[in-house]
Amino acid sequence: MAGCGEVSHSANMLPTNKKLVEPCPNSAPSLSVPECAICLQTCVHPVSLPCKHIFCYLCVKGASWLGRRCALCRQEIPEDFLDKPTLLSPEELKSASRGNGEYAWYYEGRNGWWQYDERTSRELEDAFTKGKKSTEMLIAGFLYVADLENMVQYRRNEHGRRRKIKRDIVDIPKKGVAGLRLECDAANVNLARESSADGADNMAALGASSSQPTPVLPTRLHTSLSTTASHALSHSDVTSSLENSFAQLQIGDPVIGRNNIGEGEEGQPLINARMPAPSALLEESEPSDSNDHGSPTLQHNSLLVPQSNRLPFGNP
């Protein structure tokens, strides 16, 4: 009892303007930075999922590729969440993009540069000042290697895919920070999900290629000479059959045209194409089986005899 009385007495002896625990009315309440349950560190650019769980933006990005579900409650993540995330502190993104004149690290994207998040940028700067040749970074669940001699980055298990990096001041023009676009680029953001773990928009090339019209090449009409010429010959009139054969031959031989036409030019007209001699065309148009036509075929073959081998007129 005495102890309690002493404590009460000592507390009552304090001045009235001083208390044991007195919050400062003028100071803003300190907001503790939440911890990420994926990387087990303090959140960098924390985002809140529809299920109210909070993670780093890049951690959510990496986890969504595996199953597109929350890492804690397994609730489904919306399809457009990575393009329109719910940031807990948007002013933090603005301050990180502006900086105070110090240096920052960037990785190359399509049509611009992305700034690393603050934690990764500090790790790169620390390795650079210590003179290290390379360092490893954990970004969106993937382990990357930063080659500080050649200024490139690549995944540790995939050396073929490389991306340029650089060290520059914070105030240079940029696309965004850690895959989060700035407000100036919000109107131009593509709703398609970006396919790179570090925020590079590789899907823009697919959209540009799909917007270009695909040329349609016209097809040539191939004419079969053997079938047409065989039906064109008449037993009664050899002259008319020759005229019909020449009419069919003027359409064009696919073999001749194929030799003169280049790749992708099948629909263009032939220019300066050399036509074969009439005797050769007649030989090609002649049917292989001469037994079906009888004597008219023999008369037709006599027309193909060279002039030097013919007998003069009047000699039997």
UniProtKB/Swiss-Prot annotation:
Keywords in alphabetical order: Cytoplasm, Metal-binding, Nucleus, Transferase, Ubl conjugation pathway, Wnt signaling pathway, Zinc, Zinc-finger
Bias type Polar residues, positions: 293-310
Free-text domain note: The WWE domain mediates non-covalent poly(ADP-ribose)-binding.
Positions of the WWE domain: 91-167
Residues that, per the record, bind a glycoprotein: Y107, R110, W114, Y144, Q153, R163, K175
InterPro entries: RING-HC_RNF146 (IPR044110), RNF146 (IPR033509), WWE-dom_subgr (IPR018123), WWE_dom (IPR004170), WWE_dom_sf (IPR037197), Znf_RING (IPR001841), Znf_RING/FYVE/PHD (IPR013083), Znf_RING_CS (IPR017907)
Region named Disordered: 257-316
Subcellular location: Cytoplasm, Cytosol; Nucleus
Lineage, opening ranks: Eukaryota, Metazoa, Chordata, Craniata, Vertebrata
GO terms for biological process, alphabetical: positive regulation of canonical Wnt signaling pathway; protein autoubiquitination; protein K48-linked ubiquitination; ubiquitin-dependent protein catabolic process; Wnt signaling pathway
Coiled-coil intervals, chain numbering: none
GO terms, molecular function: poly-ADP-D-ribose binding; ubiquitin protein ligase activity; ubiquitin-protein transferase activity; zinc ion binding
Organism the protein comes from: Xenopus tropicalis (Western clawed frog)
Uppermost EC category: transferase
UniProt name for this protein: E3 ubiquitin-protein ligase rnf146
Function: E3 ubiquitin-protein ligase that specifically binds poly-ADP-ribosylated proteins and mediates their ubiquitination and subsequent degradation. May regulate many important biological processes, such as cell survival and DNA damage response. Acts as an activator of the Wnt signaling pathway by mediating the ubiquitination of poly-ADP-ribosylated proteins. Neuroprotective protein. Protects against cell death induced by DNA damaging agents and rescues cells from G1 arrest. Promotes cell survival after gamma-irradiation. Facilitates DNA repair.
CDD domains: RING-HC_RNF146 (cd16546)
Cellular component terms (Gene Ontology): cytosol; nucleus
Predominant localisation class: cytoplasm
Pfam families linked: WWE, zf-C3HC4_3
Pathway named in the protein's UniProt entry: Protein modification; protein ubiquitination
Reactions the enzyme catalyzes: S-ubiquitinyl-[E2 ubiquitin-conjugating enzyme]-L-cysteine + [acceptor protein]-L-lysine = [E2 ubiquitin-conjugating enzyme]-L-cysteine + N(6)-ubiquitinyl-[acceptor protein]-L-lysine
EC id: 2.3.2.27
Zinc finger annotations (RING-type) as residue ranges: 36-74
Key word RNA-binding present: no
